[in-house]
């Protein structure tokens, strides 16, 4: 299966630290339509574990992909319902 | 004797009907419990008002709200400082009583040292782009976290309720907190 997906919205929280990447991701995904994908860009290394934990513990979201790109951590979250 | 048999038969059919009713009753309450369980709850008691100790309840409250939890933070004693709109912006860090501080207690006890350590901490918070107490509190309020101010300590410590952030609940006591805790999936005392 192809991993390709369209990004609906991008949230840039570069420079911000815990708990803001998770908190702002939650607020941003609320505005994404069902089936849409939120791209979240963070420089917080803790966001890799935190976003994974948040996505697992939260209804209606699915973590599609996480990419570590140097100092940048990219997260792709789908709104499922 | 002869009357026993039909009545015993009645009893059995009654029992079956009762069992059926009981099963339905239990199924209903299981469904209710499951519906209840879907809504996770966290209850935090915040008792400290120093800059370092104001962070944990607010970070956990905003994060739990991001998870979709119903969150209540009950503030009592020095924890009320966090709800005070002006003073929450100027919370202090104590330079004594913490052996991990870079200054020994005898130095930390010099007048003005709390101001120095507080300034150092504020600078780090700023340099690190860590959210401020005010930012965390307002974000949490926006996300539906309920902040409660303990009535007894409001009066004991002579707070003016009008000086709390808008949206703070007053007129609550230990029984409210206890009920929240009994209902919550996570209970914390900070």
Regions found by a protein language model. Give the residues of each.
Chain A
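Haloarchaeal acidic low-complexity proteome signature biased toward cell-envelope/secretome components but also
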Residues: 1-7
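Generic intrinsically disordered, low-complexity segments enriched for polar/acidic and small residues
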Residues: 2, 51, 70-73
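Short amphipathic
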Residues: 7-14
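Generic signature of intrinsically disordered, low-complexity segments enriched in small/polar residues
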Residues: 8, 57, 76-79
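Preference for bulky hydrophobic residues occupying beta-strand positions
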Residues: 11, 40, 75-77
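Amphipathic, hydrophobic secondary-structure cores in small proteins
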Residues: 13, 19-68
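C-terminal edge-of-domain segments
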Residues: 62, 67-81
